[in-house]
Design a protein with these regions (language model features):
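Hinge/lid segment of periplasmic solute-binding proteins
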Residues: 102-153, 205, 209-211, 295-297
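Extracytoplasmic/periplasmic solute-binding protein
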Residues: 140-144, 149, 175-227, 273
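A structural signal for short loop-to-beta-strand junctions that line the ligand-binding cleft
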Residues: 89, 96-97, 122-158, 189-191, ...
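Extracytoplasmic "Venus flytrap"/periplasmic binding protein-like
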Residues: 63-128, 156-162, 169, 267, ...
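Conserved C-terminal helix/tail region of periplasmic/extracytoplasmic solute-binding proteins
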Residues: 159, 183, 360, 366-367, ...
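Extracytoplasmic/periplasmic substrate-recognition and gating elements
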Residues: 67, 161, 288-353
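Glycine-centered hinge/linker elements that transmit conformational signals in sensory
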Residues: 178-179, 224-258
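Short, solvent-exposed loop/beta-turn-alpha elements that line the ligand-binding surface or hinge
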Residues: 116-130, 193, 197-200, 215-240, ...
Length: 439
């Protein structure tokens, strides 16, 4: 498992054990991948969003500095602390020259800091202009990776339980299989799902990624791509899949508040569970299971037409350049971005299975060595409809945190009254946070 050695805590005060989109550890990521600054060449300061990719970004920064002489500093924010850390760092005299937002909602907060990328070299490398993040007539950001998540599963364990992927085409099928495994878990020696940990290293999988499904289907039904007033049309479906996870997992649901992302990884890699909700970025943590033994299913919630549903594919990773940086630093940052997606060293680190394992929306994207990426591509080639990442329209981090807290309370005591807390967090708090964001 990949352990992060350099994590910058929120406000540079609190270090969190974390696993944002996969495994990580703790520490301070304020080490510089460069030495003395040559102001004539400019310099780069990248505030990285992904703790699980910290080590690779540090290596890539060093490689670029060794090759060009341009100093590159990479600082990695702790899981769930990026926005807080970005606010803190932007207030400093040497602020990040390269940062990221998650899409339109994030851009609304930082648009006044974004350099217009129109005419920059990196835009010429994109495979589609849909990865440009617009602010009016300006191009404020560029998506640098696409990722996919779903229900990763162990083929051998599923087969031992008497099933294959072909037996699971809907929520009803998944429920049948999971509950059957639970009934026979002592005989089989494993559970259906890894623990749905709700500590800060794991809760994003459910308050954000799982919550994406009911939002996506509501948007599809209403023919919209964003809203300031979510209705919660598919909240019953959200409850059904959450119930399935927490009542057919490796631990009692009352223990989930203290379960971590590392716990789930350990449970999956030691064959304690068949299913593990995560994405293509998790491959490095679970590779020991074996490429031929890894599968991935759509996350079914019982929505209409889900038999044609694919995996959840998208991006919430848009690079933005700080327009308040010096002219030299802006150019150095633009050059670094372009090098990352065009050079042999950059693309290998970004796309390779031994690197970050990204699929990048640029012409030099490499054929993936990550079997989970290939599974995602296979779903699309067979005509399944990818589930858009609608969580970039979630109104705020506070909304996610409130939803996560309500889910945790409900898991410990699964009553209708406690589910009402989830409904309130989902619907009422959405409207409240959306209204606050527009003030």
């Amino acid at each position: 498992m990949r352990k992060m050695k350099r994590l910058l805590a929120a406000g540079l005060a609190t270090i969190m054990a974390c696993s944002m989109l996969t495994g990580c550890g703790s520490g301070s990521s304020d080490k510089k991948a460069s030495s003395d600054k040559d102001s004539s060449k400019g310099s780069v300061y990248y505030l990285n969003f992904k703790p699980e990719a910290d080590e690779q970004w540090q290596e890539l920064a060093k490689e670029y500095t060794d090759e060009t002489g341009v100093p590159v500093t990479v600082v990695t924010a702790a899981a769930n602390q990026y926005e807080t850390t970005l606010k803190s760092e932007m207030g400093k005299s040497e602020a990040p020259t390269l940062f990221q937002v998650n899409g339109p909602v994030g851009l609304a907060s930082w648009k006044d800091y974004c350099y217009d990328l129109t005419g920059s070299d990196i835009l010429n490398e994109l495979t589609s202009d849909k990865f440009e993040l617009k602010n009016g007539d300006e191009i404020a950001g560029v998506g640098y990776c696409t990722e996919t998540y779903g229900l990763i599963y162990n083929k051998a364990l599923l087969k031992k339980a008497g099933y294959t992927q072909d037996d699971i085409k809907s929520f009803a099928d998944l429920k049948k299989v999971a509950e059957d495994i639970t009934k026979r878990k002592d005989e089989l020696g494993f559970s259906a799902f890894t623990s749905a940990g709700m500590d800060g290293s794991s809760d994003w999988r459910f308050k954000t990624h799982l919550a994406n499904l009911p939002i996506y289907y509501e948007y599809q039904k209403d023919g919209i791509t964003d809203t300031k007033a979510i209705k919660g049309t598919y909240l019953d479906n959200y409850r059904n899949i959450w119930d399935l996870y927490i009542n057919n997992g490796t631990c009692d649901a009352k223990q989930l508040s203290k379960k971590t992302g590392d716990d789930a990884v350990a449970e999956f890699t030691t064959e304690q569970a068949v299913f593990y909700q995560n994405g293509t970025w998790a491959y490095g943590d679970i590779a020991d299971v074996g490429d031929d033994n890894l599968g991935m299913l759509p996350i079914y919630i019982g929505a209409p037409g889900e038999e044609k549903q694919g995996l959840c594919t998208g991006t919430e990773n848009y690079w933005c350049v700080n327009k308040n940086a010096s002219k030299e630093d802006i150019q150095a940052t633009l050059d670094f971005m372009n090098w990352c997606v065009t050079s042999e060293e950059g693309t290998k680190m970004m796309c390779g299975a031994d690197g970050m394992g990204f699929v990048i929306p640029f012409k030099n994207n490499l054929e993936s060595e990550n079997p989970l990426v290939n599974i995602a591509n296979d779903y699309m080639e067979k005509g399944y409809t990818p589930v858009d990442w609608t969580f970039s329209t979630m109104p705020s981090e506070q909304w996610k945190n409130d939803l996560g807290s309500a889910l945790t309370t409900y898991a410990a005591d699964q009553t209708d009254a406690n589910w009402k807390l989830v409904q309130t967090a989902f619907v009422d708090e959405w409207a409240k946070e959306a209204a606050a964001a527009t003030k």
